């Protein structure tokens, strides 16, 4: 399945559901309490993060998609913490505020990256479904997907009214279901239960065949557009009427914390569908996102650069031959990680030991090496008739196989100045015995604060000499 990074900036999503605050007390533990056989935690840091439906909205915004959120809170400091955090992330929050009920808070006591205790502060909300529906209807015209983030805490009491309102606007509805009554999600475009939630409705599934059969029957009964069952370490399974099941293996490299993984799945799905991705591609992106987030501690969001790198790994484009557009994307991501970009260029017609040594020295000037290669027309103009010996595709393929080289790209001009202006490397490297000021592009690189270096060439290593020797043989 071919994956690409969606245009999330053009994918507005509305999230409606149970808003909560995830609060973390971090501290050290070095002794047991004399009062009871429990550890004593010396609290050193208090951290608040949006949770529940608020975490879904935060994940959507972190991907770069416009996110709006409708939910219910109390009139307290936890609400203000949510408002501040969401505003800082660019989420437009519309909260129904209840004076006599608290905002839901999940307090976790953490020590040495381990959760020791969780305390829940909550009461079922006594909400006004009509007021919530009014808020949602006022926002539907400006979004492309509606997400129902249901934790069974009372914010969502009119599921069918919300689904029907979205359908009148032609907007797909995604629901992360809770409880043992999935009838309330009838007519949804997609629901995303985990395996435990799914089996609580349909009964135990002995194998994948039974899961598929029971899932198909559930879709028929509830008139669902699709069903996605998330299965932890076994990945996820997408079922659609009149389509073969799609099984995707889990992508996590290391699992530290599954908190909020379901939120990440539905948020990535929603943003991807809003950006115009087909459902299988959106599910594959959500699977990659889940694999990233479970490698983080606590309720966490993933960023667009993190997902983009995962897509590039999946498509085998993290290294190697690239288009200019692909190169600019990976350079941007590498720079965001604090990596120093090195740039060099040349014809590299017949690769020899001198080239390899030079490229290794160039790579040592930073963290990532970009090699820009003259295309065939450019080489012919520079070197004369009969050159290049090897086509640009072959030259680039050989360079991409070198350990020192991260990315290879070609250019059609006689000099790489236009490409340099786009890449803006931290270090421009050229091999030869001339001065820095004679290097093409040196003025451009130095003007924005970059560094230009000239490396010596390996003696008795010349492509031109090799070509002449072969011709005389």
From Swiss-Prot:
Reactions performed catalytically: D-glycero-beta-D-manno-heptose 7-phosphate + ATP = D-glycero-beta-D-manno-heptose 1,7-bisphosphate + ADP + H(+); D-glycero-beta-D-manno-heptose 1-phosphate + ATP + H(+) = ADP-D-glycero-beta-D-manno-heptose + diphosphate
List of catalytic residues: 263
SUBUNIT field: Homodimer.
Binding positions (ATP): 194-197
Stored Pfam families: CTP_transf_like (PF01467), PfkB (PF00294)
The protein's name: Bifunctional protein HldE
Keyword flag Glycoprotein: no
UniProt-annotated stretches for the region Ribokinase: 1-318
Organism of derivation: Stutzerimonas stutzeri (strain A1501)
């Amino acid at each position: 399945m071919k994956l690409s990074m969606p245009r999330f900036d053009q994918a507005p999503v509305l999230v409606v559901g149970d808003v909560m605050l995830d609060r973390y007390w971090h501290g050290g533990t070095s002794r047991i309490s004399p009062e009871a056989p429990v550890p004593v935690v010396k609290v050193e840091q208090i951290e608040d993060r949006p949770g529940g439906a608020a975490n879904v909205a935060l994940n959507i915004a972190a991907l770069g998609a416009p996110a709006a959120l409708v939910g219910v809170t109390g009139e307290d400091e936890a609400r203000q913490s949510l408002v501040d955090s969401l505003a800082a992330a660019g989420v437009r929050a519309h909260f129904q505020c209840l004076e006599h009920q608290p905002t839901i808070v999940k307090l976790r006591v953490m020590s040495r990256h381990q959760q020791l205790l969780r305390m829940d502060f909550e009461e079922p909300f006594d909400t006004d479904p009509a007021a919530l529906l009014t808020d949602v209807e006022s926002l539907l015209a400006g979004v492309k997907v509606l997400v129902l983030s249901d934790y069974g805490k009372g914010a969502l009491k009119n599921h069918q009214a919300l689904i029907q309102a979205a359908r009148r606007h032609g907007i797909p509805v995604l629901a992360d279901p809770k409880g043992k009554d999935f009838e309330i999600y009838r007519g949804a475009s997609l629901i995303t239960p985990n395996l435990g939630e799914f089996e609580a409705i349909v009964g135990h599934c002995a194998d994948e065949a039974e899961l598929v059969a029971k899932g198909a029957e559930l879709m028929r009964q509830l008139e669902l557009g699709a069903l996605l069952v998330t299965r932890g370490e076994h990945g996820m399974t997408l079922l659609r009427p009149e389509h073969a099941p799609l099984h995707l293996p889990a992508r996590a490299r290391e699992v530290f914390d599954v908190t909020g993984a379901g939120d990440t799945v539905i948020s990535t799905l929603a943003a991807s569908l809003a950006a115009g991705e087909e459902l299988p591609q959106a599910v594959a992106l959500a699977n990659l996102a889940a694999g990233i987030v479970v490698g983080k501690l606590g309720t966490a969001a993933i960023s667009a650069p993190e997902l983009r790198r995962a897509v590039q790994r999946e498509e085998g484009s993290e290294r190697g031959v690239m288009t200019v557009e692909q190169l600019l994307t990976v350079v941007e991501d590498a720079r965001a990680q604090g990596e120093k970009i090195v740039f060099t260029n040349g014809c590299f017609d017949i690769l020899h030991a001198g080239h390899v040594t030079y490229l290794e020295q160039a790579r040592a000037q930073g963290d990532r090496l970009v090699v820009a290669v003259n295309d065939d027309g450019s080489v012919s103009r520079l070197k004369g008739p009969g050159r290049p010996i090897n086509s640009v595709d072959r030259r680039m393929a050989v360079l991409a196989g070198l350990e020192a080289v991260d990315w290879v790209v070609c250019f059609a001009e006689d000099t790489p100045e236009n490409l340099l202006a786009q890449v803006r490397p931290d270090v421009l490297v050229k091999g030869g015995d001339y001065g820095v000021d004679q290097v093409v592009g040196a003025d451009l690189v130095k003007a924005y604060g970059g560094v230009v270096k000239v490396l010596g060439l390996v003696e008795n290593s010349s492509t031109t000499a090799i070509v002449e020797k072969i011709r005389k043989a």
